[in-house]
Amino acid sequence: MFFRSVLASPLAGIGLSLAEIGDSILVGHGIGINAIAAVGFFSPVYLLFSFLAFGLSTGGAIVYNNLMNEGKKDEALRIFNSFTLVGCTTAVIIPALCLLFQDGLLSLLGLSPADGEVYEMAKSYLPFMVLGGSFELITEVLNAYMRNDKDVTFSVILQTVCGISNLAISIVMLFVFNWGVAGCSFGFFISNLAAALVSALYIIFSRGELEFRFRFAPLRDILKPLRLGFATSAEYIFGAVFNLIFIHILTNLSDVEAVGIYNIIEDISIVFIFMFEMIGKTSQPVFTEYHAEHNEKEKNRLFRYCLIYSVILGVAFTVLMTVYPQVIDLLFGMEDVSDASKVYFAAAIFGIGSVFMGISLLTQNVTQAKGDDKGVFALVFLRQLGFGIPVLLILSLFGVNAVWFVYPLMEVLSLAGFYIISRIRKSRKKTAEAAVYCTSFLLNDENLFKELDSIEAFASGHGVDNSSCSKLRLSLEEICGTVEEHGHDDVRVQLSVAVNDDNSVEVHIRDSISEFDPFSVAAERVENRPEGVDEVDFHGLGMLIVRYHTRNLLYRYYQGFNTLTYRIEKE
């Protein structure tokens, strides 16, 4: 699943990030360092929208995926529609407040009319920027559920096209129509508006499980995914506080040019963040599925692959910036920067920290996929507030060059702190390990019956009664037999069987053949058998019996594999 879901994701992340930082790139070339500074002052506002977008999307999408894996489709759709409603409501309220209180917002960001040209450019940039942020919020909410349904590829393509369109429209508005910085924010607005509309239409007309309904989850069912989502997205609000403090420190230590340099470093960080986040976001649905299946072996394997991948990419891009720093000139056009070596130095120090940042972001996504909101919040808090701000304040005592070392120091210290906290929490955890049997094998009669014997012995040994053991064996034999009949010679099957405290059994089956629901055989051959046909199809009849004896049965073609989930309850 790593190669199918994750391998190409950094390319999409790089494309998205270049579009996201396109405003700074374009105004740097077209206007100058003052324009970069004007755009840079809005970094906290971008972080606020990111905080809301990921807080309202990720936690709910993970709960949606878990409910689907448990066969609870109606409850899952209620979660989806509840968070869609909350997201759309938020996307109306926030820009309305920003537009009503523009002067107050600019003052809060550290701008005043005394800043002259920078203030005027920032004021023209604001309206389309906040409108675009609202539609970006809606797009992210819808796309998070699409990734957790079965549309990872479409979601990545849509967001990449949105980013490229943003860049293209901004180029036209800035260089052809001479709209200045406002033209860049207009490109951000119109591209995200289109992406939100396309996302909604895709959900309406696609063959996935998602659908818009006027049926919502009760408040108590919404609170947990809210906590889970905002535990991670709190990094953006913490980041906004961190950015404000960093900007004020740079203003006191140096001048507006230092803020422009900081914005360049922040834009470089967006490339790394998007790259690492795309690895985390595309792997998160798979982590969530493995977690629901209690498949620790595959979950740990996927984590190792993603971790190695993140470290390799972080090191490679850091080496590129260090050996060939002129790439920063090509991106941002720094002709009016008094000393380009200041930017190169800051970028090199940030690059060292980015390697550890990749590890942190991946750890956040994996912890979130487990539903551990406390663990996620601990890591997020340590990165930005717990270590980030104290280290920044200490380094500011040693001058403007020293403050850039905050990037590697806060990442290393936060990872060390999170490791210590995780060890303490694990030592205090008293819950017993779940009884789980996981296996993967080439589907043939010999392998199947060998695994069935082992699974039956496993279930019986963990207190499952004889009747449930018989139903478990029957269901697996019939389902795998039907898959083998409709598959090719080298069908691979992955099984996960978990025995719960009440001695009920959860079963997850994944196979590698083309899209095929084994229970469609029962409908085609038995329930809808043509009149006059007396011959009984035993595979179809067997699947009917399995359907009768199982609960929470759900089939999905997910991440390129047929996935069946069901439950066998004690009578």
Describe the predicted segments one by one.
Residues 1-6, 200-236, 425-439, 533:
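Interhelical loop/hinge segments that connect adjacent transmembrane helices in multipass membrane
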Residues 27-47, 116-121, 181-184, 224-228, ...:
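Interfacial/gating helices of multi-pass transporter permease domains
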Residues 36-96, 136-154, 262-319, 359-371, ...:
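Small-residue-rich hydrophobic transmembrane alpha-helices
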Residues 93-123, 127, 316-337, 344:
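Short membrane-interface helical motifs at transmembrane helix boundaries
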Residues 114-139, 337-360:
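Alpha-helical transmembrane segments of multi-pass membrane proteins
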Residues 153, 163-197, 325, 384-415:
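Membrane-interface helix-loop junctions in multi-pass transport and translocation proteins
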Residues 466-493, 548:
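Conserved ATP-binding N-box helix of the HATPase_c
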Residues 505-543:
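Glycine-rich/acidic phosphate-handling loop/turn and adjacent ATP-lid/helix
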